[in-house]
């Protein structure tokens, strides 16, 4: 009788660990953050607290399943080489704006993206970074194409 109880307890403990691990993965926990500075053409400095997505698995998930992204925060996608980046909004319920940034930190494009839209939003040239923020944040902060992200 004691042996069956121990086996049952071990089974339920293992099941609980599995369920917790599975549910934590879907929640898409926050990544490490860094305060980024954007120098505008007018001479202002604009700051954004950005999560850093620098691995394939973190870049793939991005802001998926996140219902609210506060103003002044974002996610910087870091790639190893320059390429024409394409993003979509699969499983992303929050409207976002994206800036495509070259290897020197110069913002080349800014686009708005609609929640759950599966259309590609492509950079117009080769870039190395993409910065996603709540939709309209770049405009509200006075950030424009040609401004420069101070790279780390």
Q: What role is predicted for each listed range?
A:
Residues 25-152:
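Compact, glycine-rich, soluble single-domain proteins
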């Amino acid at each position: 009788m004691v042996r069956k109880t121990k086996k049952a307890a071990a089974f339920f403990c293992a099941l609980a660990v599995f369920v917790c691990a599975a549910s934590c993965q879907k929640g898409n926990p926050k990544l490490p953050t860094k305060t980024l500075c954007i120098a505008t053409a007018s001479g202002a400095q604009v700051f954004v607290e950005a999560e850093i997505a620098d691995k394939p698995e973190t870049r793939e998930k991005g802001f998926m399943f996140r219902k609210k992204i506060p103003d002044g925060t974002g996610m910087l996608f870091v790639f190893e080489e320059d390429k024409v980046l394409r993003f979509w909004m699969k499983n992303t319920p929050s409207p976002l704006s994206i800036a495509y940034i070259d290897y020197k930190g110069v913002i080349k494009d800014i686009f708005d993206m609609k929640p759950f839209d599966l259309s590609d939003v492509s950079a117009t040239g080769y870039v190395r970074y993409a910065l996603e923020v709540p939709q309209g944040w770049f405009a509200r902060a006075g950030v424009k194409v040609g401004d420069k992200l101070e790279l780390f």
